[in-house]
C-alpha cells in the first residue's frame, strides 16, 4: 500500500554531498528524508570510487614497499592478484558503510532505499525493487545523486573483458595485460595499481600530456615514473573501434595503430545521474553530460531545489561535495550560507607515488605575469625519507618575489596528499600570515617529511636578490 510522507527536506543520494546536506539539516532541527537508490548508504564514493580505489592502491603500495626495501632482504618476491587485493577493498567498504549507516540512524534521518523521481516541485516518488511506490513531500529538496562512468554507445560494456571504473571492481580473472583508455585521474590511478601488480599496462591518452591541469613539472614527474616502471603511454590517441574477442580486447586507434590486451578499462569521462529524476516534471534541465547549473548557494533554477556534488561538475571531489552539502544545508536553514568553498581547493591524486597540489601552477602564474620564485626540496635529501626508503618525490613552493606570499604548493611522492595540508594551512592565513618565511621561522619535528617545507623555503629564499 502506497504511503505518503511529509518532511522538511528531501535529500536524493547518500554520498558525501548528500551526507553533508542531511547531517547539516538535522543539526538545525529539520526532519530529513534521504533517498538512496541502493540498499547501502555511501554513494559512488564509498562503493565504486574513492574508497575502493584508494584501498586497492594502499594494498599495492605495501606490496611494492616490501619487495623493494632492502631491509627485508627477501629471497622471494611477494605477489598478489587483482582479486586478492579486492578483498582488502571490500573490508574497507563494509567498515565505511556501517559507520555511515550509523550517522543516519543516530541523527534520526529516515532512509528510503529506492529510485527517486520528481512528481512536482515539492513531491518526489520512491520506487522500490518490489514494484511498490511511496511519495514524499518537502519544502526543500537537495539533489546529490552523483555521477557514473560515461559509457559511449559504440563500446560493448556487456562484453566480459570490457570494464568501466565501476565494473572493474568485479574483475575476477588475472589479466597479464590491460589497456586503460583515458588518462585522467581515474585512469592514472588504475595504471599505478595494475602496474604495481606486474600487469602490463597500455595507457591511452586523448590529450598531449598526462593530467594537464597539474603543474607541468608534476605531470612530467608522473610521466617519467610511469615510463620508468614500464607503463606504455600513448598520447593524442582516440579509438576508432573497440573490439571484444574471446580472450581479450583489441583497440583500433584513429591513427591506424592497434593495441591488444586481456581486458580494457574505459575511464574517459563521467555523466551525472539525472536522467531518471524526472527533471522535466519540475522544469529543470541538465546539460549534455547530465549536470545541473547552480548559484553560489547551490540553488538550481528553482530556489527551493538545491544540487551538490558530482551532479554539478567541477571540482568533482568527495571533500568538496561534503562541504557543498553543508553549505546548502545552511542556506536552507537560515536563508543564506555563512560558509563557502575555499578558493584554493587541494587536489589529491592517488597514483603511486601520490600527487597533491593547492593554488596556482607555474604556467598559470607566468601567464598572469606574476613575479614569483620557486623553492624546491627533494625527498631523497630528507632523513625521514631515507629511513623509510621513500626517496622518490619532491615538494615545490611557489611564492611572490616581493611579498613572499605563498601562491601555490605542489608535491609528488609518498604521503603527498597529507603533506600538502601543512602548506595549505599557511596559504589560508590572512594578510601577512601567508608567508614563506613561516617555514624558516618555525620548528619542525626531526626527522619528518614535513621538514621538506623548511628545505624548500630556504631554497627559494636563497634565490632572491
Swiss-Prot record:
Keyword flag Cytoplasm: yes
Biological process according to GO: 2-oxoglutarate metabolic process; NADP metabolic process
Cofactor binding notes: Binds 1 FAD per subunit.
Enzymatic reactions: NAD(+) + NADPH = NADH + NADP(+)
Pfam families for the chain: Pyr_redox_2, Pyr_redox_dim
Location within or outside the cell: Cytoplasm
Cofactor(s) it depends on: FAD
Cited InterPro entries: Class-I_Pyr_Nuc-Dis_Oxidored, FAD/NAD-bd_sf, FAD/NAD-binding_dom, FAD/NAD-linked_Rdtase_dimer_sf, Pyr_nuc-diS_OxRdtase, Pyr_nucl-diS_OxRdtase_dimer, STH_gammaproteobact
Alphabetized UniProt keyword annotations: Cytoplasm, FAD, Flavoprotein, NAD, NADP, Oxidoreductase
Similarity annotation: Belongs to the class-I pyridine nucleotide-disulfide oxidoreductase family.
Protein's name in the database: Soluble pyridine nucleotide transhydrogenase
Organism expressing this protein natively: Serratia proteamaculans (strain 568)
Amino acid at each position: 500500500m502506497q504511503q505518503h510522507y511529509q518532511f522538511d527536506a528531501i535529500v536524493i543520494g547518500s554520498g558525501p554531498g548528500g551526507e553533508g546536506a542531511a547531517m547539516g539539516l538535522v543539526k538545525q532541527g529539520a526532519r530529513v528524508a534521504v533517498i538512496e537508490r541502493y540498499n547501502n548508504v555511501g554513494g559512488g564514493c564509498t562503493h565504486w570510487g574513492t574508497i575502493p580505489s584508494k584501498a586497492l592502491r594502499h594494498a599495492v603500495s605495501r606490496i611494492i614497499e616490501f619487495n623493494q626495501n632492502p631491509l627485508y632482504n627477501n629471497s622471494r618476491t611477494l605477489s598478489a592478484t587483482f582479486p586478492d587485493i579486492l578483498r582488502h577493498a571490500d573490508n574497507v567498504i563494509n567498515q565505511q558503510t556501517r559507520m555511515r549507516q550509523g550517522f543516519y540512524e543516530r541523527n534520526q534521518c529516515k532512509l528510503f532505499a529506492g529510485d527517486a523521481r520528481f512528481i512536482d516541485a515539492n513531491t518526489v516518488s520512491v520506487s522500490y525493487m518490489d514494484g511498490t511506490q511511496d511519495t514524499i513531500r518537502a519544502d526543500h529538496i537537495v539533489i546529490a545523486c552523483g555521477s557514473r562512468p560515461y559509457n559511449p554507445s559504440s563500446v560493448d560494456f556487456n562484453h566480459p573483458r570490457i570494464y568501466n571504473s565501476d565494473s572493474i571492481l568485479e574483475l575476477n580473472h588475472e589479466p597479464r595485460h590491460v589497456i586503460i583508455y583515458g588518462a585522467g585521474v581515474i585512469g592514472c590511478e588504475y595504471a599505478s595499481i595494475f602496474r604495481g601488480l606486474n600487469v602490463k599496462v597500455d595507457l591511452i591518452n586523448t590529450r598531449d600530456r598526462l593530467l594537464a591541469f597539474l603543474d607541468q613539472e608534476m605531470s612530467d614527474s608522473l610521466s617519467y615514473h610511469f615510463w620508468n616502471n614500464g607503463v606504455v603511454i600513448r598520447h593524442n590517441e582516440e579509438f576508432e573501434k573497440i573490439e571484444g574477442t574471446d580472450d581479450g580486447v583489441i583497440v583500433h586507434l584513429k591513427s591506424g595503430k592497434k593495441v591488444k590486451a586481456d581486458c580494457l578499462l574505459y575511464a574517459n569521462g563521467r555523466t551525472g545521474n539525472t536522467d531518471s529524476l524526472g527533471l522535466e516534471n519540475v522544469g529543470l534541465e541538465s546539460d549534455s553530460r547530465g549536470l545541473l547549473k547552480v548559484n553560489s548557494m547551490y540553488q538550481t533554477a528553482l530556489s527551493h531545489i538545491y544540487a551538490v556534488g558530482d551532479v554539478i561538475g567541477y571540482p568533482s571531489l568527495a571533500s568538496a561535495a561534503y562541504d557543498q552539502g553543508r553549505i546548502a544545508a545552511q542556506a536552507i536553514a537560515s536563508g543564506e550560507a555563512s560558509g563557502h568553498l575555499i578558493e584554493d581547493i587541494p587536489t589529491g591524486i592517488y597514483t603511486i607515488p601520490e600527487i597533491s597540489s593547492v593554488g596556482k601552477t607555474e604556467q598559470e602564474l607566468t601567464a598572469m605575469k606574476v613575479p614569483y620564485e620557486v623553492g624546491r626540496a627533494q625527498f631523497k635529501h630528507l632523513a625521514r625519507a631515507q629511513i623509510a626508503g621513500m626517496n622518490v618525490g619532491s615538494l615545490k613552493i611557489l611564492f611572490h618575489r616581493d611579498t613572499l606570499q605563498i601562491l601555490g604548493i605542489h608535491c609528488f611522492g609518498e604521503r603527498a596528499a597529507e603533506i600538502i595540508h601543512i602548506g595549505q594551512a599557511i596559504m589560508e592565513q590572512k594578510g601577512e600570515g601567508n608567508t614563506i618565511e613561516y617555514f624558516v621561522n618555525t620548528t619542525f619535528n626531526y626527522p619528518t617529511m614535513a621538514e621538506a617545507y623548511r628545505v624548500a623555503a630556504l631554497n627559494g629564499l636563497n634565490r632572491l636578490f
